[in-house]
Amino acid sequence: MSYRKLGRTSSQRKALLRDLTTSLIVNGSITTTEPRAKEVRKTMDQMITLAKKGDLASRRKAAAFVRNVVADVKEDGDDIKIQSALQNLFEDIAPKYADRNGGYTRILKTMPRRGDGAKMVILELV
């Protein structure tokens, strides 16, 4: 199994990937370094594939990985509906890619980071 170590221990790397994947689900795009984006792309494709299945086991696997954060708050008169990142993944993102087999994300290269010259990219959902 090959993966990028990203200069971190395994627990730190897993936490980083969980955070970046959750941010991508909530915001639709993130700005990060190129190696991180390439790793997040793998996990995001896995999460969308699980969401497309839509069964209980897939939902539980995704819930074990995606952070429990608020993705959207909708007000409808007196009712306030709070949507989590997991609900956003299963209800909004997965139906959008129902007829697509992989390749759910796009990497756009931007200018290098000013401080250390690291290659920066924008990772977004297609």
Curated annotation (Swiss-Prot):
GO cellular component, one term: cytosolic large ribosomal subunit
GO molecular function: structural constituent of ribosome
InterPro entries, alphabetized: Ribosomal_bL17, Ribosomal_bL17_CS, Ribosomal_bL17_sf
Record has Mitochondrion as a keyword: no
One GO term (biological process): translation
Domain of life, per lineage: Bacteria
Keywords associated with the record: Ribonucleoprotein, Ribosomal protein
The UniProt record lists the keyword Methyltransferase: no
Assembly description: Part of the 50S ribosomal subunit. Contacts protein L32.
Annotated family: Belongs to the bacterial ribosomal protein bL17 family.
HAMAP family in alphabetical order: Ribosomal_bL17 (MF_01368)
Protein known as: Large ribosomal subunit protein bL17
Organism: Limosilactobacillus fermentum (strain NBRC 3956 / LMG 18251)
